[in-house]
């Protein structure tokens, strides 16, 4: 298995992984459609302008079996930008092999090399143990559905 940077040519794979991730978390089909419609232009633009750094995991046969990325957003705080890990996904038949861990470590290293003081993410129930093992901590972020 190898981890490689994603390119603009990997756009469809990134979108497919994002939708599969939410499907695995139990989101209904109608919500998945909305997520895809909103995600496509944002990811396309962010991939093109460098606001999204993605990586893909390839099996020994060179098929893509997982991926993840960092979305860099403007943020008024101690740093002018904030890094958000997103779209961490591994196809079911390749899970429990440390692939997600390597994807996330690669993304953390990328953030560290660019001078970010922290990196954020929203963890799924299944992903939370991995992120805690890597040192992520729960924060006091809150949300109000409108």
Listing of model-derived features with the role each one plays in the protein:
Residues 2-16:
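A short beta-loop-alpha structural element at the N-terminal edge
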Residues 19-42:
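Conserved GNAT-fold acetyl-CoA-binding loop/helix
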Residues 44-56, 84:
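A short helix-loop-beta-strand connector motif used in the catalytic cores of GNAT acetyltransferases and
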Residues 56, 63-72, 84, 89:
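Conserved beta-strand in the GNAT
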Residues 73-85, 95:
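A conserved beta-turn-beta hairpin within the catalytic core of GNAT-like acetyltransferases
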Residues 75-78, 120-126, 132, 137-146:
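Conserved catalytic-core motifs of GNAT/GCN5-like acyltransferases
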Residues 94, 98-106:
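Conserved acetyl-CoA pyrophosphate-binding loop and the N-cap/start of the following alpha-helix
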Residues 111-123:
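Conserved GNAT acetyl-CoA-binding A-motif
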């Amino acid at each position: 298995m190898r981890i490689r940077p994603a390119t603009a040519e990997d756009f469809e794979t990134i979108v497919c992984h994002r939708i599969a991730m939410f499907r695995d978390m139990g989101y209904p089909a109608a919500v998945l459609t909305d997520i895809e419609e909103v995600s496509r232009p944002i990811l396309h633009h962010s991939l093109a302008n460098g606001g999204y750094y993605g990586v893909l995991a390839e099996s020994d046969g060179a098929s893509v079996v997982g991926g993840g990325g960092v979305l860099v957003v403007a943020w008024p705080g101690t740093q002018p930008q904030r890094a958000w890990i997103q779209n961490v996904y591994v196809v079911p038949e390749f899970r429990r092999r440390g692939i997600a861990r390597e994807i996330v470590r690669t993304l953390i290293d990328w953030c560290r090399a660019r001078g970010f003081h922290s990196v954020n993410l929203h963890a799924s129930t299944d992903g939370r143990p991995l992120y805690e093992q890597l040192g992520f901590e729960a924060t006091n972020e809150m949300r109000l559905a409108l």
